[in-house]
């Protein structure tokens, strides 16, 4: 059984990490769970698993991030790439440049989320460097 996350996977505008325990406590029993505006997936990742769970989001960058995490080899590569990313304005600026490489897109999403001022940094919205 996978371990429950102890921190949000990615800072996301409107993220429910702190509210997730309260939200989960007030959920009725269910077999199907749908996250229509998935974002960082804080509630989905913290709630007990059920028969069917659906994650959806219009933002292709965050959807790509979760696709990369789903693949064990890519997940390990993403973790390593993030560990080796220096906390620098140049990296932050580079994170807004387009790339076709799925792993690099996921890393850049993480960089924008971690280094951007405000949680909107994970999106393509331009934010300040923190």
Question: Residue spans of the language-model regions?
Answer:
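Class I S-adenosyl-L-methionine-dependent methyltransferase module
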Residues: 49-130
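S-adenosyl-L-methionine
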Residues: 1-38, 42-43, 48
